[in-house]
C-alpha cells in the first residue's frame, strides 16, 4: 500500500511556534564527526559504522542530552553487519540475488531490523535499487542486485519488506538511478544517460512498484537525468538532488511519491561541487526535498538561510512545510514501534551462511578446468584486502570457493 504521511494537528501547532533555527534542526540529518554538541538539537542523526557497544553508547549519550524524540540512522544495505561490528555479516545485495532465494533476502531484512533496533537505530539508508548497467561503475558493483530490473526489484523488495515488517525504516537509493556511468557522485555530478523510454522501463518501473508497495523514504542522488531535465544557465544538467523537474515533476507528480525525500550526503562533490554549498542546500528544499543528509545546523548555516529568506530565494513557508513533514514522519514511527521484534538471532548466522553458500557459483568455465586438480603441489599466496568488519565474511567465501580447487 502506498505510503502517505499522516497529518498531525499537534505537530502543526508545534511547527508554527518554531523559529528558523528550530525549524532547520528538523530538516537536517547531521553525522557525528568529532563532537556531539551540534547534533543534540537535531531530530535526526547519522552514526558512522563502529562497534556494537560504541554505537549503542553514542545513541544513548545523544538521547540523554536531547529534550525531544530522535531517529537514528546508518547505512545497512545488506544486513546490519555492514555497519555494526558485532552484528551478523551478510554478504551483499548481489549475493542475495545470486543465491536465488527471495525468502533469504527477506530474512536478511528481518535480521537487520532486529540487530539495528537493539543498538538503538530506527532507520537505514538501504536497499540500493540501482541497476548494474555498466560493470565499470565505481559506485554500484555488488551493491546492486543485478543487471536485470526484475531481479533488482524482486530481491530489494524482499529486503525492504523484512526491514519494515520488523520496524526499521527503509530508504531506496539512489534516485534517479546509478549504475550506468563510470563517474562517482563523491567526486562529481554523475549522469544517468538513459532515454525517457529506457528510464521508464527500468528505473521508473522499479520506483513505481516500490511506491505502490509502501516505501517511506527515497534518497535523491547527485545524479543528473537529461532525459527528464533541462540544462542550467551554464549549460550543465543539475543533479536530481537540486532539480525541481526530477524531484517534484517526475518523482512526486508522475510517479506519485508522497513520502520523505532525503538528499545523499551534502559533502559529496556531486552536490557541493555543482554550486555553492549553502545555495545548494536551499535549492534542495526548493526542488522538493525534505531533509539534508550530513548538513549541520551551525550558526553559519542558520545565518545563510536567513539571508536567502530575506532575499526571497527561500521562503519560511517551504521550511515550515518540510519541518512539518519530517516531524509527522518521526511521530508516526514512534507511535507505531514500541517493542523489538521476536529474537531469532541464533538463526541469523545460518541465514547469512546459506546466502554465501548459494551465491558462490561458476559463471564461466570455457575449457572445463574446474574443479582444478594438479598432479604436483602448488603454493599459492591468497591475499585479501578488506576492512576488519569484512574478515569473517571473507573467510566464509574463501571456504566456499575452495570447493572449486584443490591445490
Question: What are these language model-derived features?
Answer:
Residues 62-89, 105-132, 152-179:
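Glycine-rich, aromatic-flanked loop segments that form ligand/cofactor-binding clefts
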Residues 25-32, 43-47, 70-78, 123-127, ...:
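Hydrophobic faces of well-ordered beta-strands that scaffold small-molecule active sites
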Residues 24-35, 93-107, 188-201, 269-275:
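Active-site mouth loops of central-metabolism enzymes
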